[in-house]
């Protein structure tokens, strides 16, 4: 296993953990309402899809998309903390340890994915893709 493959695997692991935590919280958020429940379904499906894509066909585009998903999840959480998110989660959310841990994992995934994109010669992500 190369260092480039290891870095992609770290991103995949971060995707899987994020997806799993969000999926586990779907029922509790449906109890709050349809919007929060649907929001958590989306927050589960997006990183899960990224994990599958990076596992099957790692590429710069897949890494960029994954970085965007992680950034969106982190920014979305910050918005929910500050003011709520219209339609999906209109109520402000209190800071919780599990949420903070999840955001730390997503931030790690974002940083590693961005690092792979910044140093393409060092990561050799394009060579991981076979045609």
Describe the residue ranges of each PLM region.
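Membrane-interface extramembranous regions
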Residues: 1-131
């Amino acid at each position: 296993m190369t260092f480039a493959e290891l870095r992609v695997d770290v991103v995949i692991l971060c995707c899987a953990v994020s997806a799993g935590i969000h999926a586990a919280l779907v029922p509790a958020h449906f109890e709050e309402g349809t919007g929060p429940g649907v929001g958590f379904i989306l927050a589960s499906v997006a990183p899960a899809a990224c994990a599958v894509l990076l596992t099957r066909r790692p590429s710069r585009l897949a890494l960029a998309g994954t970085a965007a998903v992680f950034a969106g999840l982190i920014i979305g959480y910050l918005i929910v903390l500050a003011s709520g998110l219209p339609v999906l989660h209109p109520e402000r959310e209190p800071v919780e340890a599990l949420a903070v841990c999840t955001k730390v994992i997503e931030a790690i995934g974002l940083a590693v994915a961005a690092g792979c994109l910044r140093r393409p010669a060092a990561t050799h992500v394009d060579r991981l893709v076979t045609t």
